[in-house]
């Protein structure tokens, strides 16, 4: 099962975005993206903004499931 950090990094790379580009689009610091991808930050406060910048569901990004689906 993938972690939040793995899903975020995989999605960012699929969109051919750098951490800096994602951070700018989401309105957060690049270091915040780096800490999430490193697995240091488990529950980012700007999860919704990051998910919108990645054009994905925030529930999927956090938990790896779609809304209403059990893991």
UniProtKB/Swiss-Prot annotation:
Example GO BP: regulation of DNA-templated transcription
Cysteine pairings via disulfide bonds: none
Pfam families associated with the record: HTH_3
Positions of the DNA-binding region: 19-38
GO molecular function: DNA binding
InterPro entries found in the cross-reference section: Cro-like, Cro/C1-type_HTH, Lambda_DNA-bd_dom_sf
Span of the signal peptide: none
Entry keyword set: DNA-binding, Early protein, Repressor, Transcription, Transcription regulation
Residue ranges of domain HTH cro/C1-type in the record: 8-61
Gene3D superfamilies tied to this protein: lambda repressor-like DNA-binding domains
SMART domains named in the record: HTH_XRE (SM00530)
SUPFAM superfamilies: lambda repressor-like DNA-binding domains (SSF47413)
Function according to Swiss-Prot or TrEMBL: Cro represses genes normally expressed in early phage development and is necessary for the late stage of lytic growth. It does this by binding to the OL and OR operators regions normally used by the repressor protein for lysogenic maintenance.
Protein name per Swiss-Prot or TrEMBL: Regulatory protein cro
Taxonomic source organism: Enterobacteria phage 434
Taxon lineage: Viruses, Duplodnaviria, Heunggongvirae, Uroviricota, Caudoviricetes
UniProt gene name: CRO
């Amino acid at each position: 099962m993938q972690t939040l950090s793995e899903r975020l990094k995989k999605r960012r790379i699929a969109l051919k975005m750098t951490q800096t580009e994602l951070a700018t689009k989401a309105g957060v610091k690049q270091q915040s993206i780096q800490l999430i991808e490193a697995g240091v930050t488990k529950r980012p406060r700007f999860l919704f903004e990051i998910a919108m910048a990645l054009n994905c569901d925030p529930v999927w990004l956090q938990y790896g499931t779609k809304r209403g689906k059990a893991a």
